[in-house]
């Protein structure tokens, strides 16, 4: 890694409060990834959309930001990162869905709670000349940020990095929807109308959205049980940051609240753990400690110990 790039990466590591040894992770796993993206972008006839899919706590947003840095600093590409979280429906729109379809749709997260039309419009705009406003969602208010607070950039860009917990997940078969997967579904979706609605969205408008992904990277958790542990770890870190800043932390979730919250995501997370590896261009197998154990490129049977090139 050249000195200027190493300095940029070390600054990124400090900002993200990652361990210093993460610089070796970048050199081993993610510099080759950026080089592979460059090769794809060089032959693409449009703005390349790189998808990063993975469960909660898997490191999607960190990798998305890092990949944009590498593409810019190392390879000179114009790149921007987006999260599917930025395209949530407004709180009022979700409340309407909760009244018309199912109360669980008031909670943001699952397919059916995003503005897919806005997401597709944004992707199209990033591939055409002009100023583009990037939507932002304020999780503290559980609502879309005012448009005047959306950052803008000059398009077209070479690469869009889109990350999300359910990105590229395929719909389930109807038979798989019959039995509840957890207490939330058993008690609050006994008839199955919520999970059927969510699955219909995956098969419908979300399929068009996910089809825009040209190159899919999967951060593969070892199991769903680890997802809860990772999400709890995120909550603990947030509590520490709030305490250090002298804030009350009233928005933090206690363990029962967090467990219920994650149950909204459990069905599609489990399904993605099984279905996505066969569809991803690159799969990073994660350890329980959230380090990379191995990399596989191009579907099953293509393991690599140190590179995606």
Set out the residue ranges of the language-model regions.
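Extreme N-terminal, non-catalytic leader segments
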Residues: 1-49, 55
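Conserved lysine of the Walker
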Residues: 60
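Conserved NTP phosphate-binding and transfer environment spanning the P-loop NTPase/kinase superfamily
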Residues: 2-3, 17-23, 27-30, 166-309
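Hydrophobic positions on the alpha1 helix immediately C-terminal to the Walker A/P-loop
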Residues: 63, 67
């Amino acid at each position: 890694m050249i000195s200027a790039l190493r300095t940029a990466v070390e600054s990124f590591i400090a900002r993200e409060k990652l361990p210093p040894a993460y610089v070796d992770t970048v050199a081993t796993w993610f510099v080759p990834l950026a080089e592979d993206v460059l090769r794809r972008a060089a032959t693409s006839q449009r703005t390349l959309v790189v998808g990063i899919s993975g469960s909660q706590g898997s490191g999607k947003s960190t990798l998305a930001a890092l990949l944009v840095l590498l593409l810019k600093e190392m390879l000179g590409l114009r790149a921007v990162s987006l999260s599917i979280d930025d395209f949530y429906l407004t709180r009022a729109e979700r409340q309407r869905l909760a009244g018309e379809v199912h109360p669980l749709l008031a909670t943001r997260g699952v397919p059916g709670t995003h503005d897919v039309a806005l997401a597709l419009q944004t992707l199209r705009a990033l591939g055409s000349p002009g100023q583009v406003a990037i939507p932002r969602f304020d999780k503290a208010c559980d609502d879309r940020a005012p448009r005047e607070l959306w950052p803008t950039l000059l398009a077209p860009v070479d690469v869009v990095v889109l990350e999300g917990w359910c990105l590229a997940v395929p719909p389930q078969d109807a038979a798989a929807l019959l039995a509840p997967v957890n207490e939330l579904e058993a008690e609050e979706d006994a008839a199955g109308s919520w999970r059927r609605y969510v699955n219909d969205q995956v098969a419908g408008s979300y399929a068009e959205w996910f089809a825009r992904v040209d190159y899919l990277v999967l951060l593969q958790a070892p199991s769903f049980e680890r997802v809860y542990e990772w999400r709890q770890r995120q909550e603990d870190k947030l509590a520490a940051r709030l305490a250090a800043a002298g804030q009350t932390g009233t928005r933090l979730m206690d363990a029962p609240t967090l467990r219920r919250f994650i149950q909204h995501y459990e069905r599609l997370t489990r399904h993605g753990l099984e279905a996505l590896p066969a569809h991803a261009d690159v799969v990073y197998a994660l350890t329980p400690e959230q380090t990379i154990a191995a990399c596989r490129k191009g579907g099953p049977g293509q393991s690599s110990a140190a590179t995606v090139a």
